[in-house]
Each structure stands twice: as structure tokens, then as C-alpha cells.
């Protein structure tokens, strides 16, 4: 089972990715993790990527797709995989298809921008431990304080409204077109497309995923 997850930052992809990995026994392939691993291992692609990154440039689609192909050839991907953070653009999706990397399911988590801003803006983090709270969904026992240590909680820059709205603008411009791309792929019989309402409770979304994917 080869799965791609689509959805804006904060739409709940990470949470559902954990559920899918556990249920279907497939690894999550994150382009960030792959890049770090390839650089650490000193592979040809890793060295090439490091050179580009050291110059402060973006790693090309060719390098990323090379890494994806290497990664999915490994044993733990024989039953499938979950692609996270890739493809992000139509050229990447085209290049992936040309490289012979097919997809069985494309899952879109649909969440309005304002809901995402509320979700992410409500996050509070304990920097030392990485514990994450939410003022609405998972509040600390004492407002603004970590449950275990009593230390002050912070709002990460990434979770501030201005930053979130910038990231959402990039998503709508670059990645949202993939919704149409994979919908068309599904109509052509190349994959199945699933659009889920990501505003519902986590358990409900997981249950619907399990039902749809079988």
C-alpha cells in the first residue's frame, strides 16, 4: 500500500501517519529524514545534496526523487510506504511518475485556514522536554505552566498566526494544485483519491481511514 498524504500544515497529517504506520505496518518516508540519513551515510546523492545545502540552495527534485527511489527499494517498503512532505509540487509529482514510483492512495485532509490558525496558535510548548499542550484541546493543569516541572510554556515562532498564514499561503500556491492532479489520476484509474474532513476528532478520522483503505 503506497500512500501520499495531502493537507496544509496543521491539518493532522502527522497524527494520522502514525495511525496508518501502526495499522498497515508500513514506514513513513519523510524527505527531511532521508536527506539527513543520506548525508550522514555519505552516499553519492547525500554528498550532492550536502553540497547544494551548504551553498544555501534548495535540493533539486532530481536528488529528492533519487533518494525516494533508493529508500523505497529497501526491505521495509516491500508492503508499501507512506510519503510525507513529498511531492509538494506538480513537477515533483510528474517526475515521480516518470521515475516509475506509483501510488495506490492519495489522502487529502481538508481543514479551513482559520481552524488551522486556531489549532496551531493554541499550541504551547515546554522547550526542555518537547511536551506540547493546547489551550483548548489539551490544556496544562495550570495555565502557561508545564504539568511535570511547573516551568513556563512558550509559543513557538512556527505557531504564531503570521507565520502560520505565510505557510498556508505557500501550501495553497504550491501544493494545493496536487489535489486536482491526484483527483485526475484517480479518475484515470491510476490511484484512489480520498478527501476527509480533518476538522473532526482524531479517532473519527482514523476510523474513516481504516474503513476506506480496508
Curated annotation (Swiss-Prot):
Top-level taxonomic group: Bacteria
PANTHER family on file: NUCLEOTIDE KINASE
Known role: Catalyzes the reversible transfer of the terminal phosphate group between ATP and AMP. Plays an important role in cellular energy homeostasis and in adenine nucleotide metabolism.
Keyword Transmembrane: no
Reactions mediated catalytically: AMP + ATP = 2 ADP
NCBIfam families: adk, PRK00279.1-1, PRK00279.1-2, PRK00279.1-3
Gene source species: Alteromonas mediterranea (strain DSM 17117 / CIP 110805 / LMG 28347 / Deep ecotype)
Name of the featured protein: Adenylate kinase
Record family assignment: Belongs to the adenylate kinase family.
Gene assigned in the entry: adk
Location relative to the cell: Cytoplasm
CDD domains in alphabetical order: ADK (cd01428)
First-tier enzyme category under EC: transferase
Quaternary assembly: Monomer.
Region (NMP): 30-59
Pfam families documented for this protein: ADK (PF00406), ADK_lid (PF05191)
EC number of this enzyme: 2.7.4.3
GO biological process, one term: AMP salvage
UniProt region (LID), positions on chain: 122-159
Keywords: ATP-binding, Cytoplasm, Kinase, Nucleotide biosynthesis, Nucleotide-binding, Transferase
Binding site for AMP: 31, 36, 57-59, 85-88, 92, 156, 167
Amino acid at each position: 500500500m503506497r500512500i501520499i498524504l495531502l493537507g496544509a500544515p496543521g491539518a493532522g497529517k502527522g497524527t494520522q501517519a502514525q495511525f496508518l504506520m501502526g495499522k498497515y505496518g508500513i514506514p513513513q518516508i519523510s524527505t527531511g529524514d532521508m536527506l539527513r540519513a543520506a548525508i550522514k551515510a555519505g552516499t553519492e546523492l547525500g554528498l550532492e545534496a550536502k553540497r547544494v545545502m551548504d551553498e544555501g540552495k534548495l535540493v533539486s527534485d532530481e536528488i529528492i526523487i533519487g533518494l525516494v527511489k533508493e529508500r523505497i527499494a529497501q526491505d521495509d517498503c516491500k508492503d508499501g510506504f507512506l510519503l510525507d512532505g513529498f511531492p509538494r509540487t506538480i513537477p515533483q509529482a510528474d517526475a515521480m511518475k516518470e521515475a516509475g514510483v506509483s501510488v495506490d492512495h492519495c489522502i487529502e485532509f481538508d481543514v479551513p485556514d482559520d481552524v488551522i490558525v486556531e489549532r496551531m496558535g493554541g499550541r504551547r510548548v515546554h522547550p526542555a522536554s518537547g511536551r506540547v499542550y493546547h489551550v483548548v484541546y489539551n490544556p496544562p493543569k495550570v495555565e502557561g505552566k508545564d504539568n511535570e516541572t511547573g516551568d513556563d510554556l512558550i509559543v513557538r515562532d512556527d505557531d504564531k498566526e503570521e507565520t502560520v498564514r505565510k505557510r498556508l499561503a505557500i501550501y495553497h500556491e504550491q501544493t494545493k494544485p496536487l489535489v486536482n492532479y491526484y483527483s485526475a489520476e484517480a479518475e484515470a484509474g491510476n490511484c484512489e483519491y480520498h478527501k476527509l474532513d480533518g476538522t473532526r476528532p482524531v479517532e473519527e478520522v482514523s476510523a474513516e481511514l481504516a474503513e476506506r483503505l480496508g
